[in-house]
Amino acid sequence: MLYLHDVWVNWFEGEENGYNVCHFYEWRKDDTIELLDQVPLLKVDATLYHYIEDELLELPQKLLEDVHHKAYIRKNHERLQQEYCFVVTDGKGIIAIDTIGYNVPIRKSRLIPRQEQMVYEMVENVQAEKYEFQVEETEKEHHILSPSPFIMNGLTRKERQLKQLLFMALDQLHTTKNTAEIRYWYTEWDPSAYGTVQHMEFEDIWARLYDEAESGWSEKHEQLCERLVKGQPFFEKLWEMENEQKVN
């Protein structure tokens, strides 16, 4: 069993999509950083690695047994034993996992660059461990509230968060089935289409707005998001949390 020591982690909880587990350069001053005093390091094949990184599904029982009580966290000068905590790599990607006692990867973190380099060196000539697990036969379904990585590629942490907020607001807008309202919002997005949308039905306008907002991120996206969330306390709070940030 390989081990890493003094590993800094920034846990992202309940993330099924690896793109939301931020790399070190996107960590923020108000993130809670913890120190793993000792943590086991596993090399696995690419299929299992992506299953762990991009799902919230049961981990292989043998893997859990292999790492059981082998990690320690340093808190207030105490060394606390962790139930199931480990770092896993396929030789390309690297992610730290803490199940907080469950059998699914509840908390995920990236490592700092120096420790990532150490992982690559440690596993370079190591064979991947073989673990049996059930892979879903159907491909993972992405949808408006769990967007595909292709939609999020190239965006900063702030842009990803705001894009997901925009999608949440569009999803809520979809439930209203209010044709006058969707015409208004589409015209906000594309003023030149005012005449066109007057002759379109709700579903067609909503689908067109979603399809066009799906690509990239721009000032236009940000303005639509800000206007859509106005007057909705929960969404407004999420907006404010992102816009208080000075970076990313």
From Swiss-Prot:
Pfam family of the protein (one): DUF3603
Family: Belongs to the UPF0736 family.
Record-given protein name: UPF0736 protein BCG9842_B4111
